Amino acid sequence: MSDHVKITPMTLNFGPQHPAAHGVMRLVLEMGGEVIERIDPHIGLLHRGTEKLIEYKTYLQALPYFDRLDYVSPMAQEHAYSLCVEKLLKCEVPIRAKYLRVIFCELTRILNHLLNISSQALDIGAMTPLLWMFEEREKILNFYERASGARFHSAYIRPGGVAADIPEDLIHDIFQFVNTFPKFMDDVDSLLTENRIWKQRNVDIGVVSKKQALNWGFSGPMLRACGIPWDLRKSQPYEIYDELEFKIPIGEKGDCYDRYLVRMAEIRESIRLVEQCLNRIPDGPVKTDDRKIAPPKRSEMKKSMEALIHHFKLYSEGYSVPAGETYMAVEAPKGEFGVYIVSDGTNKPYRCRIRAPGFAHLQAIDMMAKGHMLADLTAIIGSLDIVFGEIDR
């Protein structure tokens, strides 16, 4: 009998109905035994034509579409769109609104990373982190609901400011959350970080070098895990990030384990940012006083005919944005989320292009998984942090 067993190449379908695919993703794998030789990702199963739909909506009506892109971290998308429209309008946002935006964007980052770390752990076989982390996520979703009235699709950050001010008791409750949360993170750390099985499944899996990360267009934790300290909140500061103190966590190897460590460290930095904002937040208005962009108060509408007209015009016709084009990007939890808008001077965008960070990360899956075992693929997909709402758009 021969010592060499001939391995027949095999084509394997992974997804689109697979619990570890993180959405409707189909991967066509070319296998040499149990080793991955090539991966061909098939996307577009969640394509809804968002960019085209936006062309038929007013600038205010287009906003809720952004909540539905990366539906795990909705406020980050709204933020990029609002900043882009404000840049075209040359609209100044009140300082209290800027603080509220940063508070909720950082809570959104925590929301996103909690889901990613817990689902990555579940894919590998650790169930406890998921149950613990979803309990904490529920608290943040409760803050979302108290601020905007919705748990997920909040439409809270709008061009000109935010939808509404938050009550004093909500600020107090966020403070309490911020004070108790680091202890929870220590518990998760003790559960995963030095866990032998967790390290065996993640260390040296899906390694990406600095050069490869830049060539593939990586951003966010995926890029920082490779050792490149690039963060738009530091390199191209927006809102009040230049006034706040925080570090940029970076990795060394660029493997699945480093990506996990970077996200864990980012959660702690986000807590620091929220705490600083809560300590410094000033009183004042939360939306621009230009009534053509932001609606007047209900009390004003009961007294002033002009306020009533502004309200009606805003929600029926919308506002016209000066002709021009601009690109605005924010450091979303998954990476650089960018919005490019072309305005022709009317009340609807002529063109809206969305740059989703997950799209670039998913492209590199063939490069990352080649030569690894099939079982390692779930760890790699889990560490990518992909959501198909933003990839397929």
Swiss-Prot record:
The lineage of its organism: Bacteria, Pseudomonadati, Pseudomonadota, Alphaproteobacteria, Rickettsiales. The keyword NAD applies. It catalyses: a quinone + NADH + 5 H(+)(in) = a quinol + NAD(+) + 4 H(+)(out). The gene is nuoD. One of its GO terms (molecular function) is NADH:ubiquinone reductase (non-electrogenic) activity. InterPro entries: NADH_Q_OxRdtase_suD, NADH_UbQ_OxRdtase_49kDa_CS, NDH1_su_D/H, NiFe-Hase_large. It comes from the Bacteria. Its EC number is 7.1.1.-. It holds the Pfam family Complex1_49kDa. NDH-1 shuttles electrons from NADH, via FMN and iron-sulfur (Fe-S) centers, to quinones in the respiratory chain. The immediate electron acceptor for the enzyme in this species is believed to be ubiquinone. Couples the redox reaction to proton translocation (for every two electrons transferred, four hydrogen ions are translocated across the cytoplasmic membrane), and thus conserves the redox energy in a proton gradient. It is a peripheral membrane protein. It comes from Ehrlichia ruminantium (strain Welgevonden). Transmembrane segments: none annotated. Belongs to the complex I 49 kDa subunit family. HAMAP family: NDH1_NuoD (MF_01358). Its main location: membrane. Keywords: Cell inner membrane, Cell membrane, Membrane, NAD, Quinone, Translocase, Transport, Ubiquinone. This is NADH-quinone oxidoreductase subunit D. GO terms for cellular component: plasma membrane. PROSITE patterns: COMPLEX1_49K. NDH-1 is composed of 14 different subunits. Subunits NuoB, C, D, E, F, and G constitute the peripheral sector of the complex. It is found in: Cell inner membrane.
